[in-house]
Amino acid sequence: MLVAALAWVLFVPAADWLAHQDVGSATGTLLQTARDAARGRLLTLGAGLFAGAAFLVAARALVLLRRGQVNDRYTKAIEQLGSTELDVRIGGIYALEGVARDSARDHATVMEVLTAFVREHSREQWPPPDSPRTTWITWRGRFRTSGRQQERFTRPDVQAAVAVLGRREARHDIQPIRLNGADLTGADLIDANLGGADLTEAILRDADLTRVDLTGATLRDVDLTRADLTDATLRSADLGGADLTEATLRSTNLRSADLQATTLTRATLTRADLSSAFLGGADLTEATLAGADLGGADLTRARLFRTDFTRADLGAATLIEATLTGAKWPAGSPVPPGWKLDTRTGRLIAAAGTDPGPVT
């Protein structure tokens, strides 16, 4: 009935109105010809409207179909994630990555699921306590058997989840990646994009973070003992209280980073960019900063015992109350008051008859 009523309106009143608009008060053959022409135009318009409506209906159906397919894939992937089989869990992780890649609206949900998975399972021992004496080198895909006590590494499924997080489409993020408290000992984070991530109190001992992007990330009290951060970017990152004992930070960008009370004992910071960084109270005992840029850095109350500053740029650096005993001073840089340079070793020693204590 509705279609019939619409057709009557199109072909009778509307056609008459259009015809009169074309020929005015004419009658007879001229009026009939105008009516036929008007009906033709209305037919064309009606066909276009019908085709447009059909297209919209089909497009809507396709969207719903794809939405249903994505939901099915997501549900199946979640089921796989809860499997007791390692390979099935890893398959579920990569399936979730596919969902996030194909559906921007599901990106944030998938990333939250994966970060929760990492936080929940990363502290479980790997290899399992009841496994043979096999040490898995998960980030290289190799293993070796030895009579030594098992070493602990990141679980392969947790490693897979971290890898997915590290290569996600960050432009779809709604909130920062939260890996606070996660144990990623020995994890492979090479080239990972974790800018702005929260890694508070995470454990990254012996992890490989070569070229990782941690710009603006929160790494307070994180354990980075012996971690490799070569060419990494930690610009404006918060590393307050972090432990970087024996860590490698060659050519690492730490510009404007907060390193307050950070432990950098025996760390290697060759050619690192520490310009405008805050290292108040940091411990750099026996650390190597050869060729590092410390321009404008704040080293107030820092412990710099036997620290190697060879060729380092200390322009405008603040050394208030810093301990400099045995520090290897860069040639040409002014020696702080109360200290003198041992020309044989190139290290700072207390000036004769003085006890300089910390630099003030």
What do the predicted segments below correspond to?
Residues 81-82, 118, 150:
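Alpha-solenoid helical repeat architecture
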Residues 86-87, 155:
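Alpha-helix N-cap/helix-start positions at coil->helix boundaries
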